[in-house]
Amino acid sequence: PRFISVGYVDDTELVRFDSDAENPRYEPRARWMEQVEPEYWERNTQIAKDNEQSSRVDLRTLLRYYNQSAGGSHTIQRMYGCDVGSDGRLLRGYEQVAYDGCDYIALNEDLKTWTAADMAALITKHKWEQAGAAERRRAYLEGACVEWLSRHLKNGNATLLRTDSPKAHVTHHSRPEDKVTLRCWALGFYPADITLTWQLNGEELTQDMELVETRPAGDGTFQKWASVVVPLGKEQYYTCHVYHQGLPKPLTLRWEPPPSAVSNTVIIAVLVVLGAAIVTGAVVAFVMMRRRNTGGKGGDYALAPGSQTSDLSLPDCKVMVHDPHSLA
């Protein structure tokens, strides 16, 4: 089985371990992490390798709990970390475990008790209660987690507290039955929180809007899109609105017809005065050009929603770490 461990502060990846790498080691993914002492990488590489082995045991345990065969693909996901406020104090700690994409067990907000999602998870819950797992996790979340988050914020504040404003545009995609899809794209933004909405004459179209999850662009920024289906010829009544921390004010966009379509229309209008025969030829030429140009300019980048306020003081930040204890 493949084991991957990733650490984040807010939307920025810090460190990564991948058991399928040629030389599996904990590696920095953010530039400021290169300042960390070598002992950190040695220590956490060994922890990751230990966790890889314990995760194999956990996987076999869950296969037994759910009476499943070893064939096929199965996944255990763990996420735990801490949220701190602008004063550096702990706001919330958490640990969540999922199996094959479904909730399994989670640490409650009191950091003292667990919630099991099903009968199999109850077995793990009872074992963890007897072993004092919640107390150990609470000690980590209130101690080392907060300390490391403070250190990351100090070393990486230029990256973590930056804002990259989204670049937005609207594309036009043909559909059958005199309908078109208008898709509003937001690209290259950071942090990931963003809101995209479509409006018709000032009324929000939340029920009729298709929205994708915010996606990483691979360069430290994010992308998202939202689309609506509208009647052909009514595109100008629809507006896309983009809200993001990096914008001085929200963006309002409409679909803009390509310049070639506008210039063709002007040519036809001028030729009309030259006589019926010439007008007929001009109309035929215009229709042919329109057919050649029919279709939207698509793209496979995306844009997505989620609101963020613009606060110049230090925002609340989160850190996620992966250091599992056994489910067995």
From Swiss-Prot:
Pfam families reported for this sequence: C1-set, MHC_I, MHC_I_C
Region feature (Alpha-3): 164-255
Domain of life, per lineage: Eukaryota
GO molecular function, one term: peptide antigen binding
CDD domains: IgC1_MHC_Ia_H-2Kb (cd21019), TM_EGFR-like (cd12087)
Keyword Ion transport attributed: no
Gene Ontology terms: biological process: antigen processing and presentation of endogenous peptide antigen via MHC class I via ER pathway, TAP-dependent; antigen processing and presentation of exogenous peptide antigen via MHC class I; defense response to bacterium; inner ear development; negative regulation of neuron projection development; positive regulation of T cell mediated cytotoxicity; T cell mediated cytotoxicity
Disulfide bonds, paired cysteine numbers: C82-C145, C184-C240
Protein topology in the membrane: Single-pass type I membrane protein
Region (Alpha-2) location: 72-163
Region (Connecting peptide): 256-265
Subcellular location: Membrane
Region (Alpha-1): 1-71
Residues on Extracellular side: 1-265
Hydrolase keyword on record: no
Domain Ig-like C1-type stretches: 166-252
Residue ranges, Cytoplasmic side: 290-328
This protein's UniProt keywords: Disulfide bond, Glycoprotein, Immunity, Membrane, MHC I, Phosphoprotein, Transmembrane, Transmembrane helix
The protein's role, per its UniProt record: Involved in the presentation of foreign antigens to the immune system.
Family: Belongs to the MHC class I family.
Subunit structure: Heterodimer of an alpha chain and a beta chain (beta-2-microglobulin).
Protein name in the entry: H-2 class I histocompatibility antigen, K-Q alpha chain
Organism: Mus musculus
